């Protein structure tokens, strides 16, 4: 069973926010949750090594974040199974295996997109996790790697991981990945998008649940993809222009609600900010995720500038945001 949202008959995976390294941390996810009650949120990729050997609590999250999925990076079935059990015990709603990140530091650890070249190992990893948890185990991948970019290669990968790994849900980034020669940023922009190939994959594997990811910039585009796919995952646009999430519950999930007011969202962050600051957090680490909230609204530039210049100062607290809001209110 996939996690369902609290107030909708539609599954949470219908619309999700992509796992993004250095971006979708727990502060970011708490903020995004205030914009949409329904959207499925993903953590940044967390490696099995960090969870098993790291000194920090890499599984920390706020209860308010649900539904929330943990994305794991790794390629050792036993270690992945161990981490999946820990994550389920902590209350995560889904475990996702990263088979799409092309970063050099990821390849060196033998996980991410390079795993696409070893479908049997991916199947073994998924099966090991499925055997020890009852929550969904999903895979996020690309449509190919390097010169292994034929449709037959992609189908063989899906066949192996769904058949032998018993994976029932895939999130497909509609680009291939170059494992050398391109930076992670270039790998998100240079390989061309091929949405029709992902649509065809869903038609050829109708029994599997599939979400599409890559280059999606509006809810209108998301709704078009949902004519072909089970779910849509949005990445950079949702981070850089989070205001688009204000209408997700109504437009994507059919909820009988009014769209979220961004000013109210900012003020709803104040108790969280006060709590985090009291535990040693730094305001700038929270507000950096909120800079794009008013994109397209008069005063947005002043909002960004004020936060950027003041959130890092000693003693900065929620009053900084309240002052920044006046720059928006003056323009409304």
Swiss-Prot record:
Species whose genome carries this gene: Salmonella typhi
Residue ranges crossing the lipid bilayer per the database entry: none
Protein family per UniProt: Belongs to the Dus family. DusA subfamily.
Cofactor(s) required for function per UniProt: FMN
NADP listed as a keyword: yes
InterPro entries from the UniProt entry: Aldolase_TIM (IPR013785), DUS-like_FMN-bd (IPR035587), DUS_fam (IPR001269), DusA (IPR004653), tRNA_hU_synthase_CS (IPR018517)
Record-listed FMN binding positions: 19-21, 71, 140, 173, 213-215, 235-236
EC numbers: 1.3.1.-, 1.3.1.91
NCBIfam families: PRK11815.1 (NF008774), yjbN (TIGR00742)
Molecular function (Gene Ontology), one example: tRNA-dihydrouridine20a synthase activity
Name under which the protein is recorded: tRNA-dihydrouridine(20/20a) synthase
Described function: Catalyzes the synthesis of 5,6-dihydrouridine (D), a modified base found in the D-loop of most tRNAs, via the reduction of the C5-C6 double bond in target uridines. Specifically modifies U20 and U20a in tRNAs.
Record has NADP as a keyword: yes
Active-site residues (renumbered): 101
Alphabetical keyword list: Flavoprotein, FMN, NADP, Oxidoreductase, RNA-binding, tRNA processing, tRNA-binding
Pfam families: Dus
Site (Interacts with tRNA): 98, 185, 188, 301, 304
Catalysed reactions, as listed in the record: 5,6-dihydrouridine(20) in tRNA + NADP(+) = uridine(20) in tRNA + NADPH + H(+); 5,6-dihydrouridine(20) in tRNA + NAD(+) = uridine(20) in tRNA + NADH + H(+); 5,6-dihydrouridine(20a) in tRNA + NADP(+) = uridine(20a) in tRNA + NADPH + H(+); 5,6-dihydrouridine(20a) in tRNA + NAD(+) = uridine(20a) in tRNA + NADH + H(+)
